[in-house]
Structure formats: structure tokens, C-alpha cells
Amino acid sequence: MLTKRIIPCLDIKNGRTVKGVNFVDLRDAGDPVELAAAYAEKGADELVFLDISATEEKRKTLAKLVLDVAEQLNIPFTVGGGISSVEDVDILLKNGADKVSINSSAVKNPELINQLSEKFGSQCVVVAIDAKNINGKWTVHLVGGKVPTELDLFEWAKEVEQRGAGEILFTSMDHDGTKNGFANEALARLSEDLNIPIIASGGAGNIQHFQDTFQAGKADAALAASVFHFKEIEISDLKNQLRTAGISVRL
């Protein structure tokens, strides 16, 4: 049985970590490199960096950041946010990123998934899908959940897999930030429909929520931000409790 992965997510703006990070024991909680190293030490299995800045300098800033992080980190990390071309990905992977995450650009140009998986291998390609349950139908949204599309979550996920994605990062917009648990019914259906790993995102509030998403939601990995940043959950405690519950994790 493959071990379940715990993945902290860091939002990056102009090369700095944003969205409230409360790591008191760091000199500078805004420094993604320091945070990355701290999380790796605490037992994170992977990290995700989402770049939310929209500056012209972004590509250079991000490439430099990836290089700095890669030098400090011994666990895989994924970079996402505004990646829309083979060139973007080439730069990030050359600088040390293990995977890239694409979202809106995949919806606007689905062929990009094929191009990336053919050039770099599907293991590098994570497709992030944000969806909301509207009248019983899970609808894919873009631009951080602001713009609805006509796409059905499950149909789009199947297409993404067929086009060569290696993983899907599914965020439920209904659960994100609520701390009421993950969207386990939708996650379980994704896991049943697809053969590639599914990363659960949106809704983590306590350790039980992680246990539920691995058991009921059949997720392969769980991603969270604030519960880790604000030390509401320590990764070591989380993993110990998951193991006690019979869930296979890397300690």
C-alpha cells in the first residue's frame, strides 16, 4: 500500500510567502526558503508553492525562488500559478522544481497537458481543478474559483488523465477555508473514476478531517495551508494519529 502524503501549501507573492504564516520560531516567516526547510524538517512529504503575483517580473522571481528552495529541500516540491507554456515549465524544472501545477491554462488550452507530459513526463504534471457544487453538479471554476465554466468536474478530470496528467489536485471551493473537512464524496468518486493519484484540498480543520479524507475520500494525499502555518496541527502529531488509525504514512 502506498503511503498517504501530507502536503503544506505556501502562497507566494513577489517571492515572499503571504496569507498569514505564524511560524514564531523562524526569523522571517515571509521567507519561503526558511519555511520550506522548516516544513521538510517537521515531516512534510511534499510542498506546493502557488505564485499569486501577477507582475512582469514573475518568471524571473519564481525561477530564482525555485532555485533557492531546491538547494534547501530534500522533499519533492510543486510550483503553480500562471504557468501557461512549455517554456515556463522548462525554466522551473531546470531550476529544481519536481512538478508543476497548471489550472486555468489547462482549461483554456487542454493540449498543453499533452505537450507537457510528452516533453517532461506525466510525473511532472499536476493539474489543479477548483470546483463548486451547484445544484448537485460539480462545476469547474477558474481564477481562484471566481469564474464558472461549463465543465463538469468528473468529465474534466477524466480528460485530464487521458491527456497525460500524473496527478490531480482537487480543491472544493465550497469547503475551502471552512475548516469543516474535505469534500470526501467527490474525492471518493474521483479516486474510483481515475487511476492517477488525487490530492485533496480545501477544508482541513483538524486531524480527524485528514483521517476521513484518506479513508472515506480515498485521497492519495492531503494539502492544507492555514492549519499548518498557524500551528493548529503539527505534522508529527498528525502522522502519529493517522498511523494509529491504520493509515500508512512516512514517519
Swiss-Prot record:
The keyword Plastid does not apply. Its EC number is 4.3.2.10. Its main location: cytoplasm. Keywords: Amino-acid biosynthesis, Cytoplasm, Histidine biosynthesis, Lyase. One of its GO terms (biological process) is L-histidine biosynthetic process. It catalyses: 5-[(5-phospho-1-deoxy-D-ribulos-1-ylimino)methylamino]-1-(5-phospho-beta-D-ribosyl)imidazole-4-carboxamide + L-glutamine = D-erythro-1-(imidazol-4-yl)glycerol 3-phosphate + 5-amino-1-(5-phospho-beta-D-ribosyl)imidazole-4-carboxamide + L-glutamate + H(+). GO terms for molecular function: imidazoleglycerol-phosphate synthase activity; lyase activity. Pathway: Amino-acid biosynthesis; L-histidine biosynthesis; L-histidine from 5-phospho-alpha-D-ribose 1-diphosphate: step 5/9. It comes from the Bacteria. It is found in: Cytoplasm. It holds the Pfam family His_biosynth. The active site is at D11, D130. One of its GO terms (cellular component) is cytoplasm. InterPro entries: Aldolase_TIM, His_biosynth, HisF, IGPS_HisA/HisF, RibuloseP-bd_barrel. It is an enzyme of class 4 (lyase). IGPS catalyzes the conversion of PRFAR and glutamine to IGP, AICAR and glutamate. The HisF subunit catalyzes the cyclization activity that produces IGP and AICAR from PRFAR using the ammonia provided by the HisH subunit. Belongs to the HisA/HisF family. Heterodimer of HisH and HisF. This is Imidazole glycerol phosphate synthase subunit HisF. The gene is hisF.
